Regions:
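Membrane-interface segments at loop-to-transmembrane junctions
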Residues: 339-348, 412-427, 462, 488-504
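Hydrophobic packing positions in regular secondary-structure scaffolds
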Residues: 2-332
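Hydrophobic, small-residue-rich transmembrane alpha-helices and their short perimembrane loops
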Residues: 366, 379-398
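Alpha-helical transmembrane segments in multi-pass membrane proteins
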Residues: 96, 352-360, 383, 387, ...
């Protein structure tokens, strides 16, 4: 059976399904909303959306290769035909991340309708993978009953993240209607400072005792595992103090009667609830942990941070550093490029561009100061862009390395002299190579290509090459030292990277250039 026949068979099977009632496990309040959203007028809109989706998918190679793949048009078709049971079946088979991506393709209203039709556990898993923008749209449309239901199904750390961005009144209502255990756990997490380890952790983990055997540990995992964030690492706790950790691998490879205290690792690395999230993520990266234990200031074990949350932190921090280095104001509310509004993009970019535009005044002042040199030696002007661009590129190279090194802990402000010594040597080599190549280029170009048009070509080659040599050294030193100085002073090294370095290096390179030109061509100037 070829691909086209498979597609026709799948379509025919769906066509043969009868119209189905809304699933019985959907609350009455939500059923009423769904009935309103699935009236005849709404169905016509759904048909239009489905036809547009089919046109887009007609040229999609992945869809052609997988006729049974769940697509936007197929999802809408099931909705139009009121085949709710089938819709639940096909969405259950999808990976949560893939289902979340598919839901985000739907418009806001259709996304809400489909989400309300999903099974609770399927909806909750997909919800965790959605973008902040899509999640906010759903949350804003939820009733309190739906919101409480979602919170109860979510892992506690994800639920706390969601509630952090909501108005205080809504949070209060939701917590009042939540179960006592959920309410107490969420209140604790919400009280930790933002960006601290406490706000990132979850208290849902597998708890073991030292006096247990491996067989008893497996029984404990079976009981606690459903609600635990991870079962790959279990924690041995006595009187709320962490005594050790034991991996699932160790349990599986041990005899059932083996005591836990014989196979647990008591050399435990922990972080405090007040530690910065980025520090925690770096520690997890350093030790290759999939989960990091968290203790309070008294040393009591309070929860764990899992690798998925650590990756999110590192991604956010990396994005923020890149934005700052590109002279863009970071925005916590921004999502993807297309998910961010035109106004937000402009608002992020304008402030730094204004600052840099005004700071370029210094470069203009330098140029004005040496105006006489342009009149006497107009050829000097043609080399200015190359000189400033090369110096700026050199500065950006080392500043990028320094910002990355500082972020990863590979370089510290105390390494100032070591970095200085290394960059002097590196920049001397780079400057010498660039200077020699450029000097040869200028001499050959203006001797043969522009033969007879310019005098003292050798002088120009010397001026530009020597200027380039010293400009490269200057740029490398400025680019390397500024981020270190910023870190030492408590400022963000990324801010001191590309934006300021380019301005400083441009002005200094021009001063060097014209001073060297004056020395070489002092009679002509």
């Amino acid at each position: 059976m070829d691909m086209e026949e498979k597609k026709l068979t799948a379509d025919a099977a769906e066509q043969a399904l009868p119209v189905q009632e809304l699933p019985a496990d959907i609350p009455a309040e939500v059923r009423q909303k769904l009935a309103e959203d699935l009236n005849e007028e709404a169905t016509e809109d759904l048909k239009q959306d489905m036809r547009e989706a089919e046109k887009e998918e007609a040229n999609d190679e992945e869809v052609k290769a997988n006729p049974e793949m769940l697509t936007k048009s197929r999802l809408l078709k099931l909705l139009i035909k009121k085949q709710y049971v089938k819709l639940r079946e096909v969405t259950e088979e999808e990976q949560p991340a893939d289902l979340a991506e598919l839901l985000e393709e739907l418009d806001e209203n259709n996304r809400l309708v489909v989400f309300r039709l999903l099974k609770k556990e399927v909806a909750t898993e997909a919800f965790a993978y959605m973008s902040d923008e899509a999640r906010d749209d759903l949350v804003n449309a939820f009733s309190d009953v739906e919101l409480v239901g979602a919170i109860e199904e979510m892992s506690l750390d994800d639920a706390a993240d969601l509630l952090e961005d909501m108005p205080a009144g809504v949070v209060k209502r939701v917590l009042e209607k939540s179960s006592k255990q959920t309410r107490e756990s969420l209140n604790k997490l919400l009280n930790y400072p933002e960006s601290s380890a406490g706000s990132l952790m979850t208290p849902e983990y597998v708890r073991l005792r030292e006096d247990m055997t491996v067989a008893q540990a497996f029984e404990a995992i079976r009981k606690q595992g459903e609600n635990a964030e991870t079962v790959y690492t279990c924690y041995v706790v006595e009187r709320n103090r962490l005594k050790g950790v034991v991996s699932a691998r160790s349990l599986l490879l041990s005899e059932p009667h083996t005591p836990i205290n014989e196979i647990m690792d008591d050399n435990v690395v922990t972080v405090k609830v007040t530690d910065d999230q980025e520090y925690v993520a770096r520690e997890m990266q350093r030790y290759d942990f999939t989960a990091m234990p968290v203790v309070d200031n008294e040393g009591m074990f309070v929860g764990i941070i899992t690798i998925d949350d650590a990756i999110d932190v590192l991604t956010d921090e990396s994005t923020e550093d890149m934005q700052k280095m590109a002279a863009i104001l970071p925005d916590d509310d921004a999502t993807t490029y297309f998910g961010t509004s035109v106004w937000t993009h402009a608002k992020q970019r304008i402030p730094w561009l204004l600052i840099l535009m005004l700071s370029a005044t210094f470069t203009g002042m330098v140029t004005t100061h040496y105006e006489e040199a342009f009149v006497s030696l107009p050829l000097l002007v043609s080399f200015m862009p190359m000189l400033m661009d090369t110096a700026g590129n050199c500065g950006n190279q080392i500043s990028t390395l320094m910002v990355r090194g500082l972020a990863l802990g590979e370089v510290e402000p105390s390494d100032f002299l070591r970095v200085l010594g290394k960059e002097v040597r590196v920049s001397a080599i780079v400057g010498a190579v660039l200077g020699l190549v450029n000097g040869l280029r200028i001499y050959l170009m203006y001797t043969f290509l522009y033969a007879g048009q310019y005098e003292n070509v050798l002088g120009y080659a010397v001026v530009v090459s020597v200027s380039l040599f010293f400009s490269v050294i200057l740029a490398k030193l400025v680019g390397g030292m500024l981020p270190l100085a910023a870190k030492k002073l408590g400022a963000d090294p990324a801010i001191m990277a590309t934006p300021f370095i380019t301005t400083i290096v441009d002005a200094c390179s021009l001063i060097l250039y014209f001073q060297i030109a004056q020395l070489v061509f002092k009679n002509m100037m």
